[in-house]
UniProtKB/Swiss-Prot annotation:
Record-linked SMART domains: AAA
A single GO BP: bacterial-type flagellum organization
Catalytic activity: ATP + H2O + 4 H(+)(in) = ADP + phosphate + 5 H(+)(out)
Gene name per UniProt: fliI
Keyword Plastid among UniProt keywords: no
Source organism of the structure: Borreliella burgdorferi (strain ATCC 35210 / DSM 4680 / CIP 102532 / B31)
InterPro entries in the record: AAA+_ATPase (IPR003593), ATPase_alpha/beta_chains (IPR050053), ATPase_F1/V1/A1_a/bsu_N (IPR004100), ATPase_F1/V1/A1_a/bsu_nucl-bd (IPR000194), ATPase_T3SS_FliI/YscN (IPR005714), FliI_clade3 (IPR022426), P-loop_NTPase (IPR027417), T3SS_ATPase_C (IPR040627)
Protein name (database record): Flagellum-specific ATP synthase
Pfam families per UniProt: ATP-synt_ab, ATP-synt_ab_N, T3SS_ATPase_C
Entry's family note: Belongs to the ATPase alpha/beta chains family.
Length: 436
């Protein structure tokens, strides 16, 4: 009989018998300041609106007895004196296989008109740091389905790779190719701070219905509040970790880490943190490695391979965010505007890009092929101006002549249509034939 009542007793114990209520004192910039309620940083609160509804906000900090809150969905209808209710817990999201094939927002709510989740496996958005000793070394290659990556810039399972470029050079399209063609068990795709119209385009034209069934999309568009964009990044990462715990190889496709950094900047500046590098406060550069370190191995057989797009402002690859991210990642894919303008897609600059896993996942023979291809591209680049202007005379240098003869074939190898596929088993032989 005692066992019969245990479940009910637990439910009674979980009931909050005390309600913590505060009052809105002022709205300053992006923040709501309230006197009370009793709460902790990261807790969710509900704020009364004039129309009788409530808006969800998160506790970001304290100023004496005042609580600094940022709303997820704007401040419309909030007045001084409105009640603020603490939920005494942080954001919780549904973690179950029901997520596959779904599109959710930064609060974990479905937005794809396919109904609510039936499973109630909700978990608070709290991360446990992975012991570095438990992280496996790179051993196996993940196939991206992008010929230039699989052939010249291989990516290992558990690796974290940045896709760097200025605006309009094809970062999102490259992510779409990887999402559609990779051999990952699950895709977790994060659209953070991007244009809303891109979502349906991505699903219909780049991902496809079949691949959507193996994917989870987390969306927080550019018109949403900074806290929404910020949390969306962690929601996507936590979902990737959930599938990794099941032993699956997960591709985390994140567009873009720059928008995440901008959201964190807006939040930090609102709290009064001083800017130190091109308008970015110190906490932005603390937050980036915290997020990126979530990818990789967990020691239980699963992996999260991270592909993070980085929008380089003004094509300046030394700007603070891009430079900081480079130091954390295990590889850099550089998209070249000059290649893009010449109609070479994907416009990946092989010479400027690097993968730090090549020596662990590729045989010595394959490494030699890659180095030979890079050497030919380097020679051609050194003499490119002389070749284009007709100053270089054929026969002046055997190495240059050989590079000139192979350059069109290498460029043809690099070029790949959005819906074009290839046989990975024949890739090495194809490279050998090009370079012979």
């Amino acid at each position: 009989m005692s066992n019969f009542f245990e479940n009910y007793l637990r439910q009674v114990d979980d009931i909050e018998t005390v309600s913590f209520v505060g009052r809105v004192q002022k709205i300053k910039g992006l923040l709501v300041e309230s006197l009370g309620p009793q709460c902790a940083i990261g807790d969710l609160c509900l704020i009364d609106q004039r129309n009788g509804k409530k808006v969800c906000a998160e506790v970001l900090g304290f100023n004496g007895p005042y609580v600094s809150l940022m709303a997820y969905e704007g401040f419309s209808g909030i007045e001084v004196g409105n009640k603020v209710y603490s939920l005494n817990k942080g954001l919780e999201i549904n973690l179950s296989d029901e997520l596959l094939g779904r599109v959710i927002d930064s609060l974990g709510r479905p937005i794809d008109n396919k109904g609510s989740f039936l499973n109630n496996s909700y978990k608070e958005l709290i991360f446990e740091k992975i012991n570095p000793i438990n992280r496996s070394i790179f051993e196996d290659q993940i196939l991206t389905g992008v010929k230039v990556l699989d052939g010249f810039l291989p990516v290992a399972k558990g690796q974290r790779v940045g896709i760097f470029s200025g605006s309009g050079v094809g970062k999102s399209t490259l992510l779409g190719m990887i999402a559609k063609n990779s051999n990952a068990d699950v895709n977790v795709i994060a659209f953070i701070g991007e244009r809303g119209r891109e979502l349906n385009e991505f699903i219909e034209h780049e991902l496809g219905e079949e691949r959507l069934k193996k994917s989870v999309l987390v969306v927080s568009t550019s018109d949403e509040s900074p806290i929404s964009r910020y949390k969306g990044a962690y929601v996507a990462t936590m979902i990737a970790e959930y599938f990794r715990e099941q032993g699956k190889d997960v591709a985390l496709l994140f567009d873009s880490i720059t928008r995440f950094a901008n959201a964190k900047r807006e939040m930090s500046l609102s709290l009064g943190e001083p800017p130190v590098a091109k308008g970015y406060p110190p906490s932005v550069f603390v937050e980036i490695p915290i997020l990126l370190e979530r990818s990789g191995f967990n020691g239980n057989g699963g992996s999260v391979t991270g592909f993070y797009t980085v929008l380089v402002e003004g094509d300046d690859f030394t700007e603070p965010v891009a430079d900081n991210i480079k130091a954390v990642l295990d590889g850099h894919i550089i998209l070249d505007r000059d290649l893009f303008d010449r109609g070479i897609y994907p416009s990946i600059n092989v010479l400027s890009s690097t993968s730090r896993s090549i020596h662990r996942i590729m045989s010595l023979e394959k490494q030699k092929l890659i180095m030979k291809a890079r050497n030919l591209l380097s020679i051609y680049k050194d003499y490119e101006d002389l070749i284009r202007t007709g100053i270089y005379l054929k026969g002046s240098n055997k190495d240059v002549d050989f590079a000139i003869s192979k350059y069109p074939k290498i460029i043809n190898f690099i070029s790949q249509g959005i819906n074009e596929t290839f046989d990975f088993e024949n890739l090495e032989d194809e490279i050998k034939e090009i370079l012979s």
